[in-house]
UniProtKB/Swiss-Prot annotation:
Residue runs in coiled coils: none
Residue numbers of Phosphoserine PTMs: S111, S467
Protein name, as recorded: Methanethiol oxidase
Organism of origin: Rattus norvegicus (Rat)
Role, per record: Catalyzes the oxidation of methanethiol, an organosulfur compound known to be produced in substantial amounts by gut bacteria. Selenium-binding protein which may be involved in the sensing of reactive xenobiotics in the cytoplasm. May be involved in intra-Golgi protein transport.
Length: 472
């Protein structure tokens, strides 16, 4: 059992202690209506994931936001394991930044975990006025008690990779984390490692570039990101920018969970590879490609070659396995990273995607598969789209999956997702030998929501997880 502590703060003392935490019973995830044709606000869904419950794999609560077309996306906490030593802190508020409207919602999940309620709304004009930032993405809680949220743009939608700071108690906007004028040219995700005085951040593109869909000409014009920015954690400034060789659109970035670690991984979406970043003996940082998913030559698609499009990555809490999703090819992969320089493929499962048999795309040349995968049918439902956001249980034995990336790109690449809504699936993980297997008894079909098909995105457990919590 996990260590009992009567005077500790939120989360767990170490990542390995977290692995001993209780099994997840509910999951929170934002559901989006922007670009679906349904004039309804985005909402936070609560899903029952307890196999013993009569409501297993059902949405048990919906909290609608008060505005339309926010595009909720990712979420974070008011406090987490970085404040484990502070008994005055309680993980009871979920932070929901909007990637399009730039509005921030603070949701009370502490009073009634199965029926969250809105606690506070931070309007875009306050973010714009105090920070000159917009289009907000990743939210992390800090050991200082503050909440830090990455931005992708300025108020006009130009690229600007800065960070909004909120007071973790009042949720007042305090200003920017970075020094004035010290932002990165583009933003997206970030992760910090205080023992080494380092933060790393990634790049998608300017909101004006990505917001209405993907244009390959924008890649040729250099409008999509290809860098990792290395920041001095104490001085709040960029100390190194790593240009990644063959690393287009670096999205999710993760240090190893071990707070002493000096390395981690980033998923590069368009170039469909995983790159390892690491600290050199001299104190500088470098990056190297360690996994490559080959593109497939195809017919009947927007381009002659289809990348895997790695859109989410996760590390198990014991830093043993790396997981990632290929949203276009349709598979999730599991790699043993005991040797981080040479990840070893240990599991793979196809969950839909763009190359299934009987679809509009014909694969002409494939370096990996001998035939196109079968469409995925779960509980009689043919699953539209491909695997996208992933979340691992604390013990590493269950992987939850959703299928929506971002509404405008869903509409472009998987129009049937807009018509049918996304789904939530669950994969059983073999942590002894490696391996992934679909749980045929679990399906949340967001195509059957009361107001019409919705696009469900990132997943969070009430007690924290392997992409929300950072240990210091």
């Amino acid at each position: 059992m996990a260590t009992k502590c009567t005077k500790c703060g939120p989360g767990y003392a170490t990542p390995l202690e977290a692995m001993k935490g209780p099994r997840e019973e509910i999951v929170y995830l934002p559901c989006i209506y922007r670009n679906t044709g349904i004039e309804a606000p985005d909402y936070l869904a609560t899903v029952d994931v307890d196999p013993k419950s009569p409501h297993y794999s059902q949405v048990i609560h919906r909290l609608p936001m008060p505005h339309l077309k926010d595009e909720l996306h990712h979420s974070g906490w008011n406090t987490c394991s970085s404040c484990f030593g502070d008994s005055t802190k309680s993980r009871d508020k979920l932070i929901l930044p909007s990637i399009i409207s730039s509005r921030i919602y603070v949701v009370d999940v502490g009073s009634e975990p199965r029926a969250p309620k809105l606690h506070k709304v931070i309007e875009p004009n306050e973010i714009h006025a105090k920070c000159n930032l917009g289009n907000l993405h990743t939210s992390h809680c800090l050991a200082s008690g503050e909440v830090m949220i990455s931005s992708l743009g300025d108020p006009q939608g130009n690229g600007k990779g800065g960070f909004v700071l909120l007071d973790g108690e009042t949720f007042e906007v305090k200003g920017t984390w970075e020094k004035p004028g010290g932002e990165a040219p583009m933003g997206y995700d970030f992760w910090y490692q205080p023992r080494h005085n380092i933060m790393v951040s990634t790049e998608w593109a300017a909101p004006n570039v990505f917001k209405d869909g993907f244009n390959p000409a924008h890649v040729e014009a250099g409008l999509y990101g290809s860098h990792i920015h290395v920041w001095d954690w104490q001085r709040h400034e960029i100390i190194q920018t790593l240009q990644m060789k063959d690393g287009l659109i670096p999205l999710e970035i993760r240090f190893l969970h071990d707070p002493d670690a000096t390395q981690g991984f980033v998923g590069c979406a368009l170039s469909s590879n995983i790159q390892r970043f690491y600290k050199n003996e001299g104190g500088t940082w470098s990056v190297e490609k360690v996994i490559q998913v080959p593109s497939k030559k195809v017919k009947g698609w927007m381009l002659p070659e289809m990348p895997g499009l790695i859109t989410d990555i996760l590390l198990s809490l014991d830093d043993r396995f790396l997981y990632f999703s290929n949203w276009l090819h349709g598979d999730i992969r599991q790699y043993d990273i005991s040797n981080p320089k040479k990840p070893r493929l240990t599991g793979q499962i196809f969950l839909g995607g763009s190359i299934v048999k009987g679809g509009s795309v014909q694969v002409l040349e494939d370096q990996e598969l001998t035939c196109q995968p079968e469409p995925l049918v779960v509980k009689g439902k043919r699953v539209p789209g491909g695997p996208q956001m992933i979340q691992l249980s604390l013990d590493g034995k269950r992987l939850y999956v959703t299928t929506s990336l971002y509404s405008a790109w869903d509409k472009q690449f998987y129009p049937n997702l807009i018509r049918e809504g996304s789904v939530m699936l669950q994969i059983d993980v073999d942590t002894a030998n490696g391996g992934l297997k679909l749980n045929p008894n679990f399906l949340v079909d967001f195509g059957k929501e009361p107001l019409g098909p919705a696009l469900a995105h990132e997943l969070r457990y009430p007690g924290g997880d392997c992409s929300s919590d950072i240990w210091i």
